[in-house]
């Protein structure tokens, strides 16, 4: 009887600790909402829905969340507001905010948490350098920077160079500073100089890739798993990655892409197999594969 009462008190204490933790997280994370009431309700619903499916892998969770967000309208520039604080918008996404959102949702369940405040915290963790929003340049704009920073902190792992047939590309990442007028935030001299400082770390940056030609073969297709984060390398000078999405394997065994498509105007499970998608997009040079968690 005494042991039973002790367990009840212990469980209550754990629940209280988690509640206080979530409350503290909310207080510590300045957040800009598109629709706070609707978004927090939907985040809670998404987390509860996927948590109820049991012991899924991280990749399965990412895939499930990605499918649940299909038909979300494509909206560019949702983060381009001042001051730079964490922005949450489930009503409209571009390719980057879509991937960040599903990754943060899956990350929250991987931590055995299910509160919307925990999702908000995790979204900030993966979007910003060292998890802290501190001006425009603290956002991880270049996907290579996003991968390096999140890998260093054990949140993501790039597995591209562990897959058979991988190659590499060497590029100097300076697209943003060379196209300053395309980024309104860079009209501010301090932000511009900070972005240039970030780019200094990516001069002659070497990164792994699976060549587009390889990924158009059955051998290449077989390398992709359900829920992989796929980043598409580009021919564009000064830029590493031009698009990003989530892999899903169709019943015929072929990988497709769930992504926020500007062409379709919404998040879609692309009807084209990945190989055909690559064949049609001549500016894509290859694919990088990233997975959630520290997989070293």
Spans of model-derived segments:
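C-terminal soluble interaction/assembly domains
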Residues: 230-294
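Cationic-aromatic interfacial patches
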Residues: 29-100
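Acidic/His-rich structured neighborhood in mature extracellular/periplasmic domains
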Residues: 69-204, 253, 259-262
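Boundary at the C-terminal end of the N-terminal hydrophobic targeting segment
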Residues: 25-27
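Bacterial N-terminal signal peptides that target proteins for export
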Residues: 2-13
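Short, well-ordered loop/turn sites that connect or cap secondary structure elements
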Residues: 223-224
């Amino acid at each position: 009887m005494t042991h039973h009462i002790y367990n009840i008190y212990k469980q209550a204490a754990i629940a209280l600790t988690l509640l206080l933790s979530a409350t503290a997280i909310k207080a510590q994370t300045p957040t800009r909402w598109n629709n706070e009431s609707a978004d927090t309700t939907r985040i809670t619903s998404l987390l509860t829905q996927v948590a109820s499916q049991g012991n899924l892998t991280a990749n399965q969770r990412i895939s499930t969340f990605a499918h649940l967000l299909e038909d979300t309208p494509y909206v560019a520039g949702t983060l381009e507001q001042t001051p730079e604080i964490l922005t949450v918008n489930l009503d409209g996404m571009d390719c980057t905010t879509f991937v960040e959102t599903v990754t943060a949702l899956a990350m929250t369940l991987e931590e055995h948490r299910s509160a919307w405040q925990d999702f908000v915290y995790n979204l900030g963790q993966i979007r910003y350098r060292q998890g802290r929003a501190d001006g425009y340049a603290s956002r991880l704009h270049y996907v290579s920077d996003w991968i390096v920073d999140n890998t260093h902190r054990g949140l993501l792992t790039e597995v591209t160079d562990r897959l058979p047939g991988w190659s590499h590309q060497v590029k100097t990442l300076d697209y943003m500073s060379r196209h300053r007028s395309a980024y309104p935030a860079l009209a501010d001299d301090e932000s511009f100089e900070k972005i240039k400082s970030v780019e200094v770390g990516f001069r002659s940056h070497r990164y792994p890739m699976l060549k587009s030609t390889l990924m158009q073969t059955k051998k290449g297709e077989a390398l992709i798993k359900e829920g992989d984060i796929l980043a598409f390398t580009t021919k564009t000078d000064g830029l590493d990655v031009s698009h990003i999405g989530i892999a899903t394997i169709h019943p015929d065994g072929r990988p497709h892409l769930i992504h926020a498509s500007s062409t379709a105007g919404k998040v879609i499970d692309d009807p084209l197999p990945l190989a055909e998608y690559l064949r049609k997009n001549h500016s894509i040079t290859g694919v990088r594969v990233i997975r959630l968690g520290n997989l070293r």
